[in-house]
């Protein structure tokens, strides 16, 4: 397992437990392991109850954190992938298709970063091209045609900023998705599972409900990008994060996010199954409420929700 800098003391204890577990088991060894286990639990509860916003960002990028493909088979069943935008190509930074959630059909779409070097290159580190956004929109329109709810998983450092992406209409593709998603006639639930950065996240992030995993973030720019603009150096990222209000808890307070999905102690990477179960429960609950509304009622609430963003008050 990989550890972050603020987890060094937890690593020391877990290394000791691992070392002792390989020793011949006797009463003394078992007792020592139990003591260390209790100490580890207390340390973890203390550490994760007072995380800084920057530490939350670090957890959202943890190399062992579950990505969309990891969660797909744990949350849904009977997934059938659909490919291509029917105009240019098949962007592998986004994966989508038909699936079942608790035996009910849904259209699921998610950004995939890739785990190792080969898969990261294959999925372009989760940075979508215009054809990716058009592919996602094609699947959403298909879901609308067959009256299926849509569930999107957001995990990206941003839309791909390359010249070819700009030539193929990156900004138009994202803007088109914002327009079309705001008027879809089926329930739409969006979940930030890691990084939700800039227009790259917004391109599949407009819906009736926006959920976030506990240790994820949602922002118009990365902390490093913000620090580079304000302080001319990315090294100030940890400082600017605190004032950006980009973590799940802060965004829930600001009523940008509808619900925060709890993660296992220590983060989602420590228990994929529990994380997936929490996501499944949260999504199913939201879809149940949304499915009971009429199209007119649901779209009116979606419109009111979107128009409420950007409120301000004088200090």
UniProtKB/Swiss-Prot annotation:
GO terms for cellular component: acetyl-CoA carboxylase complex. Its main location: cytoplasm. PROSITE patterns: COA_CT_CTER. Component of the acetyl coenzyme A carboxylase (ACC) complex. First, biotin carboxylase catalyzes the carboxylation of biotin on its carrier protein (BCCP) and then the CO(2) group is transferred by the carboxyltransferase to acetyl-CoA to form malonyl-CoA. It is found in: Cytoplasm. Pfam families: ACCA. HAMAP family: AcetylCoA_CT_alpha. Coiled coil: none annotated. This is Acetyl-coenzyme A carboxylase carboxyl transferase subunit alpha. GO terms for biological process: fatty acid biosynthetic process; malonyl-CoA biosynthetic process. Keywords: ATP-binding, Cytoplasm, Fatty acid biosynthesis, Fatty acid metabolism, Lipid biosynthesis, Lipid metabolism, Nucleotide-binding, Transferase. Residues 36-289 form the CoA carboxyltransferase C-terminal domain. InterPro entries: Acetyl_CoA_COase_a_su (IPR001095), ClpP/crotonase-like_dom_sf (IPR029045), COA_CT_C (IPR011763). Belongs to the AccA family. Pathway: Lipid metabolism; malonyl-CoA biosynthesis; malonyl-CoA from acetyl-CoA: step 1/1. It comes from the Bacteria. GO terms for molecular function: acetyl-CoA carboxylase activity; ATP binding; carboxyl- or carbamoyltransferase activity. It catalyses: N(6)-carboxybiotinyl-L-lysyl-[protein] + acetyl-CoA = N(6)-biotinyl-L-lysyl-[protein] + malonyl-CoA. Its EC number is 2.1.3.15. PANTHER family: ACETYL-COENZYME A CARBOXYLASE CARBOXYL TRANSFERASE SUBUNIT ALPHA, ACETYL-COENZYME A CARBOXYLASE CARBOXYL TRANSFERASE SUBUNIT ALPHA, CHLOROPLASTIC. Acetyl-CoA carboxylase is a heterohexamer composed of biotin carboxyl carrier protein (AccB), biotin carboxylase (AccC) and two subunits each of ACCase subunit alpha (AccA) and ACCase subunit beta (AccD).
């Amino acid at each position: 397992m990989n550890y972050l800098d603020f987890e060094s003391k937890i690593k020391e204890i877990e290394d000791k437990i691992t070392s002792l577990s390989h020793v011949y088991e006797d009463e003394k060894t078992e007792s020592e392991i139990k003591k260390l286990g209790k100490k580890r639990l207390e340390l973890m509860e203390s550490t994760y109850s007072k995380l800084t916003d920057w530490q939350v960002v670090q957890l959202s990028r943890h190399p062992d954190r579950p990505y969309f493909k990891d969660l797909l088979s744990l949350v849904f069943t009977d997934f059938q992938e659909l490919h291509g935008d029917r105009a240019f190509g098949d962007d592998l930074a986004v994966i989508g298709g038909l699936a079942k959630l608790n035996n009910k059909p849904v259209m699921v779409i998610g950004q995939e970063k890739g785990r190792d070097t080969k898969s990261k290159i294959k999925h372009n580190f989760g940075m979508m091209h215009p054809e990716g956004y058009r592919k996602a929109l094609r699947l959403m329109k298909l879901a609308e045609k067959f009256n299926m709810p849509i569930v999107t998983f957001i995990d990206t450092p941003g839309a791909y900023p390359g010249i070819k992406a700009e030539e193929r209409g990156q900004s138009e593709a994202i803007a088109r998705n914002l327009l079309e998603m705001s008027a879809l006639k089926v329930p739409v639930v969006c979940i930030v599972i890691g990084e939700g950065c800039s227009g790259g996240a917004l391109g599949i992030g407009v819906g009736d409900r926006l959920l976030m995993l506990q240790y994820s973030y949602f922002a118009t720019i990365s902390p490093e990008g913000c620090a580079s603009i304000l302080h001319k150096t990315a090294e100030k990222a940890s400082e600017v994060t605190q004032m950006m209000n980009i973590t799940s808890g802060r965004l829930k307070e600001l009523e940008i996010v509808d619900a925060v999905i709890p993660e296992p102690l220590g983060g989602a990477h420590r228990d994929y199954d529990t994380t997936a179960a929490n996501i499944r429960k949260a999504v199913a609950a939201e879809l149940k409420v949304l499915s009971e509304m009429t199209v007119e009622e649901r779209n009116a609430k979606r419109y009111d929700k979107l128009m409420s963003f950007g409120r301000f008050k004088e200090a």
